[in-house]
From Swiss-Prot:
The keyword ATP-binding is assigned to this record: yes
Keyword annotations of the record: ATP synthesis, ATP-binding, Cell membrane, CF(1), Hydrogen ion transport, Ion transport, Membrane, Nucleotide-binding, Translocase, Transport
Coiled-coil region(s): none
SMART domains: AAA (SM00382)
GO molecular function term, any single one: ATP hydrolysis activity
The protein's name: ATP synthase subunit beta
PROSITE patterns on file: ATPASE_ALPHA_BETA
Function: Produces ATP from ADP in the presence of a proton gradient across the membrane. The catalytic sites are hosted primarily by the beta subunits.
Pfam families listed in its UniProt record: ATP-synt_ab, ATP-synt_ab_N, ATP-synt_VA_C
Organism listed in the record: Bacillus sp. (strain PS3)
Subunit field text: F-type ATPases have 2 components, CF(1) - the catalytic core - and CF(0) - the membrane proton channel. CF(1) has five subunits: alpha(3), beta(3), gamma(1), delta(1), epsilon(1). CF(0) has three main subunits: a(1), b(2) and c(9-12). The alpha and beta chains form an alternating ring which encloses part of the gamma chain. CF(1) is attached to CF(0) by a central stalk formed by the gamma and epsilon chains, while a peripheral stalk is formed by the delta and b chains.
Amino acid sequence: MTRGRVIQVMGPVVDVKFENGHLPAIYNALKIQHKARNENEVDIDLTLEVALHLGDDTVRTIAMASTDGLIRGMEVIDTGAPISVPVGQVTLGRVFNVLGEPIDLEGDIPADARRDPIHRPAPKFEELATEVEILETGIKVVDLLAPYIKGGKIGLFGGAGVGKTVLIQELIHNIAQEHGGISVFAGVGERTREGNDLYHEMKDSGVISKTAMVFGQMNEPPGARMRVALTGLTMAEYFRDEQGQDGLLFIDNIFRFTQAGSEVSALLGRMPSAIGYQPTLATEMGQLQERITSTAKGSITSIQAIYVPADDYTDPAPATTFSHLDATTNLERKLAEMGIYPAVDPLVSTSRALAPEIVGEEHYQVARKVQQTLERYKELQDIIAILGMDELSDEDKLVVHRARRIQFFLSQNFHVAEQFTGQPGSYVPVKETVRGFKEILEGKYDHLPEDRFRLVGRIEEVVEKAKAMGVEV
């Protein structure tokens, strides 16, 4: 076992000198363990990751926890391998830190549990799945207008309080119930309170048993925030590669991954690039994103919450992320204020899977007609606000009439929100979704009151609600 000594500490970056030229490999984990000898010292159990070889038998490392209490001359031990984290069934229902140590006070992970290194190559070209396959979510607005691809990457945009967390929980629930799939949630550089709330909400809604959670939150050093996404990805890869599952990987927030990299970049001695970001920004993002894919065995579909600094979409961090995305789901506050949940914007959300050769001609035509109707309604709203509905042509009145029904029908009750709403959640297969919207566009339900279309699953539920009101169907 190779041993070295600390020779310099610069915040989260630590330089270590090894004797006799036995340098640890890049990405190797090094350990510093020190027992406090008096009340002025603190116990130290710190993991470092080798980032650079500086020459003169010295390596530069990134700390995975606080470097408080480190002093020059402390002994460092090379573990001989990268950071390795537990994988498999033992991770489900548990909460981990970047090193794969449980932090939920539910006991230790068994010593014989399998552990995999967090740094691994992306699947080889010949291992990738060749067919584009849609991942049915059971959420109408997503499946119809911005469908997810198995093994795809989805960007989730939305401010505070518009329903990102509830949408994430519903996706976890539906994948577990309908596809038997598991989910991994990686909390990257977000608020500890939000992570704690999510854990308890998932416990209450019953989806925690199909989920592994990994957190490297805002208060942690950049090393932990930079690597925690890889820890979550490694856990998800096991379920794909060893168990042939279709899993979900949630990363909240992918911007913080880039931000953490830029924090340590200058300390590592790299020349910053545009706006102070690390020069290796595209490489680091590519190494993470290329591992998230479909193979012949299974798939990892990734849903990544994306913070856009100052709403500037040309900022290098979000711009680098966009090039990897297959679909975007945009949550709109105005829709949430209208009581339309999920508050997904049907005109801004996009997907490369919305093409006739992938979803089929009928689905494609219905989706485009829905978007055209909603777009026309949006254009007419200014006229309605100034002059009122009476000034519209008969054709435009019909557009408004149907657009409002479509807008309400894009909403539905979620299983994970049952405890708050008292209404049972609904999972709607894609075929039923397409049929429902097609019939609305054809005018089959023009005679039904528009408020009956709100928060329902299949189109038959609208008819039943109207009948209950005594409306002729």
